[in-house]
């Protein structure tokens, strides 16, 4: 498949690029600075996400939004999401995969409290979580786009690629140790698996792995 990854040099994006290439897909890394791309197997396009138009996104089976907004500019998660919605809604057959956050998940099955609103949630993370949540709500209100929003666990860290993970929908998951954890490597496995075998069209899902 032909896959474009926006934000391909970040932790999530770079692992998704590698996983997709390792599985034999054609990957285009769309980045602001081509010098930061270390994966020689990927095609590189140097372009800011806010400059992307429909013509830039044509020809891809899937566009992965792994954009990471700088601290203090977290509203750009919403802005970048809107750019991609507008760019893709006129392209038939191209799917949008969004690298989301855990803050918009519910804390438990009662589904009365979001992670980002729970006591003890870090203040400096809240703007990112809040704006990623807004992006999700906008997607849920979009009827002419094929999308999937993938939330990691509360702890999202570089680790090992085990290839094993558990899937949930809108509630924060924990592993056998009681930890809400997923490595970037296993998250990338889940993303590419969803690309290859779609199970969550126009939905959000979340993943957890062993720590």
Which residues fall in each region the model found?
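Mid/C-terminal beta-alpha module of Rossmann-like enzyme folds, strongest
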Residues: 2, 6-9, 93-96, 170, ...
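Glycine/proline-rich active-site loop of Rossmann-fold NAD(P)-dependent oxidoreductases
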Residues: 142-144, 157-164, 194-203
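Conserved beta-loop-beta element that borders a ligand/cofactor-binding pocket
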Residues: 137-157
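N-terminal Rossmann NAD(P)H-binding glycine-rich loop of SDR-like oxidoreductase domains
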Residues: 3-23
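Conserved beta-strand positions in the Rossmann-like core of class I SAM-dependent methyltransferases
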Residues: 4, 28, 148
């Amino acid at each position: 498949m032909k896959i474009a990854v926006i934000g391909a040099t970040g932790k999530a994006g770079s692992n998704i690029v590698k996983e997709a290439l390792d599985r034999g897909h054609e990957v285009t890394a769309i980045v602001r600075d081509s010098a930061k791309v270390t994966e020689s197997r990927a095609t590189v396009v140097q372009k800011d996400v806010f400059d992307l138009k429909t013509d830039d996104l044509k020809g891809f089976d899937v566009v992965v939004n792994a954009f990471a907004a700088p601290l203090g500019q977290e509203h750009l998660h919403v802005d970048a999401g809107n750019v991609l919605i507008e760019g893709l809604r006129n392209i038939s057959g191209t799917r949008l995969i969004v690298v989301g956050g855990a803050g918009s998940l519910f804390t438990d099955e009662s589904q009365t409290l979001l992670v980002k609103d729970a006591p003890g949630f870090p203040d400096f993370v809240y703007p990112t979580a809040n704006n990623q949540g807004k992006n999700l709500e906008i997607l849920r209100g979009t009827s002419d786009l094929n999308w999937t929003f993938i939330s990691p666990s509360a702890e999202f860290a570089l680790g090992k690629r085990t290839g094993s993970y558990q899937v949930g929908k809108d509630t924060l998951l924990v592993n056998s140790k009681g930890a809400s954890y997923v490595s970037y490597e296993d998250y990338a496995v889940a993303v590419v698996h969803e690309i290859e075998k779609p199970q969550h069209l126009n939905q959000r899902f979340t993943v957890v792995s062993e720590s």
